[in-house]
Design a protein with these regions (language model features):
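Extended alpha-helical interface modules used as scaffolds for assembling large macromolecular complexes
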Residues: 1-126, 131-136, 144
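Nucleic-acid nuclease catalytic cores
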Residues: 128-174
Length: 174
């Protein structure tokens, strides 16, 4: 157990956020066959964040998004990935990284994710975008390039995820 997981468990209990596996397991079972990252984000937004009352979304922040996504994904994919939050590298800190475990079919699969959280007042503007902001693309591509330099045999994929309060989400592979 880490302090982060203890905090998230406490937060979920305090706010009666349901951790019922039936909300999540089908998506993670499907991930085993298609390895598509976007449905993980969709499931997180709809099934986890969807339980929160609207007023919470003006109080949470990017750190909460990053930590709660980590807590959920690591619960169901820790048999095939290791996870890092705020992973240090030569160009900064990536928000979230999942690295395939040696000896599994996931070995050399690396996903680098940059999360951006927007409150209600900015949500519609961000949801109208057809592509992520250039500075976010440059940021996550820098993290991915650094990982690729360190681990040249890895297949590194990078993503930008916008969580726009309780109004919606966007996920791009860049």
């Amino acid at each position: 157990l880490t302090m982060r997981s203890i905090y998230m468990d406490y937060y979920n209990q305090l706010n009666k956020i349901e951790g019922n596996a039936s909300r999540y397991v089908p998506v993670y079972e499907l991930y085993d066959s298609n390895r598509s990252f976007e449905p993980l984000v969709q499931n997180y937004f709809e099934q986890y964040l969807g339980q929160f009352p609207a007023q919470v979304f003006d109080k949470i922040n990017e750190n909460f998004i990053r930590c709660s996504f980590y807590e959920l994904v690591s619960r169901y994919l820790s048999h095939c990935y290791t996870f890092a939050i705020e992973q240090n590298n030569s160009v900064g800190r990536s928000d979230f990284e999942m690295i395939g475990i040696p000896g599994t079919d996931y070995y050399t699969d690396d996903r680098v994710v940059e999360f951006k959280y927007y409150r209600s007042k900015d949500a519609d503007r961000m949801l109208a975008l057809t592509e992520p902001l250039v500075e976010h693309v440059e940021q996550v591509k820098g993290y991915a390039a650094d990982t690729k330099r360190k681990f040249p045999n890895y297949h590194v994929r990078s993503y930008i995820v916008y969580i726009c309060a309780n109004k919606g989400w966007k996920c791009w592979e860049v």
